[in-house]
Each structure stands twice: as C-alpha cells, then as structure tokens.
A protein has these predicted regions:
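Start-of-helix register in tetratricopeptide repeats
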Residues: 10, 44, 78-79, 113-115
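TPR-repeat structural position
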Residues: 25, 59-60, 94
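TPR/TPR-like (Sel1-like) alpha-helical repeat modules
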Residues: 74, 89-111
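Residue-level signature for tetratricopeptide repeat
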Residues: 18, 52-53, 87
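Alpha-helical segment of the N-proximal tetratricopeptide repeat
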Residues: 8-30
C-alpha cells in the first residue's frame, strides 16, 4: 500500500480537472475516486466531483451529490455551497439557490464568496 504526498494529490487533482475540461468525464471520475480514497479529508476533491458532474450537464446529480455526500463530510463548506447554488441556478431554481449562495457569501473562502456574489447579483 502507498500514500500520496500533498504535491502528488494536487497534481492528480489538476489532471482530473484537465480531463473534465476535455469532456473526459470517466477518466476524471477514476482519478477523483483514487484521490478520494487516499485523501478523504480534502474538500477540494468533493468540489472537483461537483464540477465534473456540472460540466457533464448533470446539475441535478451535482446537487444530489453535494447534499447527500459532500456536505455531510464537509459541513458548511463555502465552495460546495457556492457550486450547489450555481447548479440550482442553472436548473432554473433561483429561489432554492439563494440560501446556499448567501451561506457561501458569509463563509471565509474568498473565491466561493466571489462566485456566490456574482450569482446573487447577476
């Protein structure tokens, strides 16, 4: 058995996100599964899974994943909340998106707050 260093995990996460960008969702899912196994404490992997689902036009699945698994593991994570709000907005559920976006805006993650503010004000 082996472990991944933090740098190796970052590299794999970047490769997974590159695969998402090239619509290679199965490859990305495999890489993210490996990362999730070896770095289960990293919310960035959960965020990347949500991004992959949304990039595959599976916004409902992204919301279900965020609600059912990701937020259970990382309660109140601002970036997960921001992406939940984005997915709900893309699904035409703006009223439902408001609560997670406002929570992301109040969080300590500046990037999540910027995303949330853009969606709330856009």
């Amino acid at each position: 058995m082996f472990d991944l260093t933090a740098e190796e995990a970052r590299l794999l996460l970047n490769v997974a996100l590159m695969a998402v960008g090239r619509n290679r969702f199965k490859s990305a899912a495999k890489l993210l599964a490996v990362l999730d196994r070896f770095r289960p404490d990293q919310p960035s992997v959960a965020v990347a899974k949500a991004i992959a689902l949304m990039s595959a036009m599976q916004d409902g699945a992204a919301v279900a994943y965020i609600d059912g698994e990701a937020l259970a593991r990382f309660p109140g994570n601002p970036m997960l909340l921001a992406f939940k709000g984005l997915a709900l907005t893309r699904m035409g559920r703006g009223a439902d998106a408001r609560e997670p976006l406002e929570a992301a805006l109040r969080g300590e993650d500046e990037a999540a707050a910027q995303l949330a503010a853009g969606l709330l004000n856009g």
